[in-house]
Amino acid sequence: MKTMLILALIALAATSVVAQLDTTCSQGYGQCQQQPQQQVNTCSALLQQCSPTPYVQSQMWQASGCQLMRQQCCQPLAQISEQARCHAVCGVAQVIMRQQQGQSFGQPQQQQGQSFSQPQQQVPIEIRRMVLQTLPSMCNVNIPQYCTTTPCSTITQTPYNVPMATTCVGGTC
């Protein structure tokens, strides 16, 4: 019964994905610069539920749900800079850490829209290592080398979340 409750809470967290961003186009260049709002994303749920060795084991998760989460996580991740991916990796690790703490102490899961940009404590190395080893291969993206050595508390000084794709046409977004 407790396992079902935990799985239901994780599924709820995975479906409450909101990715908002303010978009501005730089003058004269017609390029978009994305300034993402801090929101919960699906990458942590993807890693927890769908990786070959998920951090939270789930035998009830369906492949179709994993495919949808993979698209929602990986497509935007592939469209951002490598530096921004480093921020995203730390953000995902923060979400997983907080969800694990909530499960361990019987507290509710992270609420939609809750910030993970100002960590209350350092992300455990095993969670960060799991994210760094799994997310790039699942999404077929490169993560900069400094992400493996720079602490997340330093990297996440600027809030970051994987944004939804934005297109610009003729300098207008």
Swiss-Prot record:
Highest taxon, organism lineage: Eukaryota
Presence of keyword Transcription: no
PTM field: Contains 7 disulfide bonds.
Transmembrane in keyword set: no
Transmembrane segments: none
MF (Gene Ontology): nutrient reservoir activity
InterPro entries, sorted: Bifun_inhib/LTP/seed_sf (IPR036312), Bifunc_inhib/LTP/seed_store (IPR016140), Glia_glutenin (IPR001954)
Task of the protein: Seed storage protein. Not integrated in the gluten polymer through disulfide bonds, unless incorporated by reduction and reoxidation during dough making. Increases dough strength and bread volume, but decreases dough stability when added into a base wheat flour.
Xref: PANTHER family: AVENIN-LIKE A4 (PTHR33454:SF4), PROLAMIN PPROL 14P (PTHR33454)
Family note: Belongs to the prolamin family.
Protein name, UniProt field: Avenin-like a5
